[in-house]
Amino acid sequence: MGKLHRGLAEFNGCASSIPPKYQTVIISNEEKKGFSSQSRRFEEYLNESPGPGSYLSHSPAEGCSPSFSKRGTGSFASKGGRVPRSFQRLSPGPDAYNLQMSLLHKHDFNRGESRIFRLPYALKKEKPNNENPAPNQYDVSYRAVDKNSTISGESAFRSKTRRSAVVSDKFKGPSPCHYKVSDVLVQKSPQALVSCFKSKTARIQSPVRNNIPGPGTYNPHQPPEPVKRTVLPRRYYLGLSAPPLIPEKVPPFPGPGHYDIVNYNRPVKHMVSSAAFLSGTNRHMQEVKGQDIPGPGFYEPTVLSKTSFLYNPAKLWIPA
């Protein structure tokens, strides 16, 4: 049901999918003797009081929390690692460079404090073989090297399209404040019932200006004005050319009495009984205008005895 560990070393085991109920840690106070001394130098006892850093407000970015099952815990928990703990970095670490002595920490307990073990001061400083900056002089970005620590389920058909659009120099058009968009293209017109045979004729037509006199302009009892004409002399006269003729003015518009007005005041027709399929054709023949128009049979077309190219409206020059 539980786990057993020995020693003070921190145990970083794999988190099982079904965690155990408790964990047993055995601490031994054994330590190695140094310099023939039997006194204990380090006394560390594990207690339940919170240590330094326990009350930090922020939590680590990568949390390792076991999953608790609804049916409880069991002794056959899986020990397979869900998230890999170690990441392989392709970039050189801090120990790959040769640091200067001045950059090392002065308070090093591995060195003696006596003057016997110190190096002499009058020494020629060695020039570094590589003048590149040290690891503590710049910040290395591991975004392109490290793998993603939060491994989650990924779809096989994951989109590879970038979310941040790269604006190129080709799209250098005017901004929205440089032009005005017509509301007709944006807003929708109210939908109403419209007939498919809707008339497009304007109901109110524009007034037409004409010089035709209106009603009441003429006076039928007033005699017409005499026409002015040039009277040529009847005798001979000396002149190099004919006398000038004054051009006639534009004839006036027709007045009342110029047209044959039809009398529409005919006797009223009385309704008589008739058949259901009475013909609506008028029996009275109207006066046909243009009596001088020749009727059928007026012409006598002559038949040509010989073929002539002059009478060839179809322009067919090949004999049939």
UniProtKB/Swiss-Prot annotation:
It is found in: Cytoplasm; Nucleus. STPGR repeats lie at residues 49-82, 91-103, 132-163, 173-192, 213-233, 254-266, 294-305. Coiled coil: none annotated. GO terms for cellular component: cytoplasm; female pronucleus; germinal vesicle; male pronucleus. Residues 46-91, 207-226 are annotated as: Disordered. Residues 66-76 have a biased composition (Polar residues). Its main location: cytoplasm. GO terms for molecular function: chromatin binding; histone binding. Pfam families: SHIPPO-rpt. It comes from the Eukaryota. Keywords: Apoptosis, Cytoplasm, Nucleus, Repeat. InterPro entries: SHIPPO-rpt. One of its GO terms (biological process) is apoptotic process. Belongs to the STPG1 family. May positively contribute to the induction of apoptosis triggered by O(6)-methylguanine. This is O(6)-methylguanine-induced apoptosis 2. It comes from Danio rerio (Zebrafish). The lineage of its organism: Eukaryota, Metazoa, Chordata, Craniata, Vertebrata. The gene is stpg1.
